[in-house]
């Protein structure tokens, strides 16, 4: 915390969900006044039930709290080191949930609301911001979440372009590259086409025989589906967003004439046999550690997804960084629209945070709110703040949102989609662990665990250095 600087202009934060609440806390704790705008309870969304700040509208779980072996647990640890209000209130309202951090949702929201309401530098304004903020608001964080009100969403869309906001996002599963069996799969672009930034071998291809294809179609149709939430039912599908199981229901050959078409590709493992269908995976991050399954947006339940998708040749032992989904959402094409400090390129006084930026999950939304708050506080005090290292969970998530994602290899709609934190977003280790303390070689699951633990240890060490070298220097300047 720094000396209070009442001469600073207030930071206006629109939306008091997890991201907005965390951002407000960070800004105020760095000595800068905050006006936190929240339209509830005077204007409710289709999902919220109360006027409480940081209301959890779906699950009450913050997922794994294991900082050594799980990426979201590591993110928990990093946020705690930075004095996160969301993590403090989650810890104080924890309920039993095994290795996960789950909370009493009402107690959690009440604790966040009280902390912000009691802070001398935070003013909570219970009115709707129904358009672009006034021009004299020079330092603004927009953290209105996936259910942004229509007037504000329209204003943001007009400021950017019609395609900048998606209101029904299609999420395809993402697989860790090193879990794909390349003795069955191969790299090749359709017709060996070299697109922008491509090489002609930009996709991983998984072949299917006729029998495998028909068994796969049956499994898709029979798989257990997630029901739409009440506020999603009337939302139409957009072009290119049909769930794969809906396509399968329209005809047994639909998929092999759509995302699974086998044309323009030759299997080098068996070049004389033409596959009946082919599943393609496309690189999903610049590091090349994550690949998404092209066209596989789905409403299958997660258990059904892992069971069905692991029947694909080459994906029998696939590890998923994210499973698929299709739900109503509002998010920006952040790599195109935001700079590295989450500011809108078209109007830099506006900074975005939370799920609107393309992160997925409670913890990730709060984490981006935390970073946005630190940046806004630095701007208000005319200070410069370096980004957290990309080797940290915070830096890896920020890097993915603002530029770590590949927009597109070939022609077609943008591919940026919401993402949970996962180890695939981190830069590879320079010297990954290969041996146990006794000198024997690490293999299988032991090797995977050792790698995750090394990434986590590196992250916390680098975060501590960043706090000492960048954050404290910026705060004290």
UniProtKB/Swiss-Prot annotation:
GO terms for cellular component: cytosol. Pfam families: GIDA. Its EC number is 2.1.1.74. It is found in: Cytoplasm. FAD binds at residues 15-20. GO terms for biological process: tRNA methylation; tRNA wobble uridine modification. Its cofactor is FAD. Keywords: Cytoplasm, FAD, Flavoprotein, Methyltransferase, NAD, NADP, Transferase, tRNA processing. Gene3D superfamilies: FAD/NAD(P)-binding domain. GO terms for molecular function: flavin adenine dinucleotide binding; tRNA (uracil(54)-C5)-methyltransferase activity, 5,10-methylenetetrahydrofolate-dependent. It is an enzyme of class 2 (transferase). It catalyses: uridine(54) in tRNA + (6R)-5,10-methylene-5,6,7,8-tetrahydrofolate + NADH + H(+) = 5-methyluridine(54) in tRNA + (6S)-5,6,7,8-tetrahydrofolate + NAD(+); uridine(54) in tRNA + (6R)-5,10-methylene-5,6,7,8-tetrahydrofolate + NADPH + H(+) = 5-methyluridine(54) in tRNA + (6S)-5,6,7,8-tetrahydrofolate + NADP(+). InterPro entries: FAD/NAD-bd_sf, MnmG-rel, MnmG-rel_CS, MnmG_N, TrmFO. Belongs to the MnmG family. TrmFO subfamily. Catalyzes the folate-dependent formation of 5-methyl-uridine at position 54 (M-5-U54) in all tRNAs. This is Methylenetetrahydrofolate--tRNA-(uracil-5-)-methyltransferase TrmFO. The lineage of its organism: Bacteria, Pseudomonadati, Pseudomonadota, Alphaproteobacteria, Hyphomicrobiales.
């Amino acid at each position: 915390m720094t000396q209070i600087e009442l001469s600073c202009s207030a930071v206006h934060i629109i939306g008091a969900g997890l991201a907005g609440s965390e951002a407000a806390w960070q800004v105020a704790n760095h000595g800068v006044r905050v006006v936190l705008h929240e339209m509830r309870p005077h204007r409710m969304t289709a999902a919220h039930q109360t006027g409480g700040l940081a209301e959890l509208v779906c699950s009450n779980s913050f997922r794994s709290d294991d900082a050594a072996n799980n990426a979201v647990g590591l993110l928990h640890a990093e946020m705690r080191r930075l004095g996160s209000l969301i993590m403090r209130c989650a810890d104080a309202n924890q309920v039993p949930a095994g290795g996960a951090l789950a909370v009493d949702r009402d107690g959690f929201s009440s604790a966040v609301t009280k902390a912000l309401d009691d802070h001398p530098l935070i003013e909570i304004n219970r009115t709707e911001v129904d358009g672009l903020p006034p021009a004299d608001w020079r330092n603004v964080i927009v953290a209105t979440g996936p259910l942004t009100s229509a007037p504000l969403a329209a204003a943001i869309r007009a400021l950017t372009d019609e395609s900048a906001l998606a209101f029904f996002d299609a999420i395809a599963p993402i697989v860790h590259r090193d879990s794909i069996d390349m003795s069955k799969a191969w790299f090749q672009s359709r017709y060996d086409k070299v697109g922008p930034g491509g090489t002609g071998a930009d996709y991983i291809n998984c072949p299917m025989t006729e029998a495998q294809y028909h068994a796969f179609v049956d499994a898709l149709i029979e798989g257990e589906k997630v029901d739409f939430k009440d506020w999603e039912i009337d939302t139409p599908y957009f072009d290119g967003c049909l769930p794969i199981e809906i396509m399968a229901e329209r005809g047994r050959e639909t998929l092999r004439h759509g995302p699974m078409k086998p044309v323009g590709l030759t299997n080098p493992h068996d070049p004389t046999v033409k596959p009946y269908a082919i599943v393609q995976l496309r690189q999903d991050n610049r590091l090349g550690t994550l690949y998404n399954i092209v066209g596989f947006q789905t409403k299958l339940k997660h258990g059904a997804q892992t069971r069905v998708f692991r029947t694909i040749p080459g994906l029998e032992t696939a590890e998923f960084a994210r499973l698929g989904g299709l739900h109503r959402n509002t998010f920006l094409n952040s790599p195109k629209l935001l700079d590295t400090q989450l500011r809108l390129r078209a109007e830099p006084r506006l900074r975005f945070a939370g799920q609107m930026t393309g992160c997925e999950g409670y913890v990730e939304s709060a984490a981006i709110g935390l970073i946005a708050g630190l940046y806004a506080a630095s701007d208000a005090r005319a200070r410069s703040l370096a980004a957290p290292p990309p080797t940290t969970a915070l830096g890896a998530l920020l890097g993915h949102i603002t530029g770590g994602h590949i927009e597109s290899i070939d022609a077609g709609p943008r591919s940026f989609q919401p993402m949970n934190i996962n180890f695939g977003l981190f830069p590879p280790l320079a010297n990954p662990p290969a041996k146990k303390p006794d000198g024997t070689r690490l293999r299988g699951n032991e090797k995977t665990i050792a790698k995750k633990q090394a990434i986590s240890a590196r992250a916390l060490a680098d975060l501590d250095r960043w706090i000492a070298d960048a954050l404290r220097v910026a705060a004290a300047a």
